[in-house]
Amino acid sequence: MLSLFADQEREAKLDSLGDPLALLDKHVDFAALAAEIDRWAPWPSRAKGGRPPYPTELMTRLLVLQQLFNLSDEQMEFQLLDRMNFQRFAELKHSGRVPDRNTIWVFRERLVQANVEHQVFAEVQRQLQ
């Protein structure tokens, strides 16, 4: 059956079933974590130009999803396009642009190069306790 409110109805159903990503979003302060990441591993200079990076908070959410669901960069890109709860968690539900596999890799590599990738996940664990 066709419904103008299908997305809202699905979201309500996800919430009533206890979407674990909604709980994660409620208990982890991703904005504060993103600010810490920007302090630990600042973005490189954009003097050469190029497309502006996606927000650190969004990319952090994607790394957490990848870790939780054991997804490759390629699968993360696919799941972002396919799964409503991933889109909602990543705050991409109404976005026409989704980070691709290379963008996800570059962000993770930024953390690896700064040797802070494990700190990110340790902070998520700390906030969940």
Identify the residue ranges that each predicted region occupies:
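Charged, often Cys/His-bearing segments associated with DNA-binding zinc-finger transcription factors
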Residues: 1-39
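Short, conserved catalytic/metal-binding motifs centered on acidic residues
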Residues: 19, 62, 76, 100-104
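DNA-recognition alpha helix
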Residues: 75-87
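Active-site- or DNA-interface-adjacent structural scaffold in DNA-acting proteins
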Residues: 89-129
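Secondary-structure capping and boundary motifs in well-ordered enzyme cores
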Residues: 13, 29, 50-58, 96-100
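Short, Lys/Arg-enriched N-terminal segment that forms or immediately precedes the first helix
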Residues: 38-51
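Alpha-helical support elements that line or immediately flank enzyme active sites
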Residues: 58-70
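Generic alpha-helical secondary-structure signal
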Residues: 36, 79, 106-107
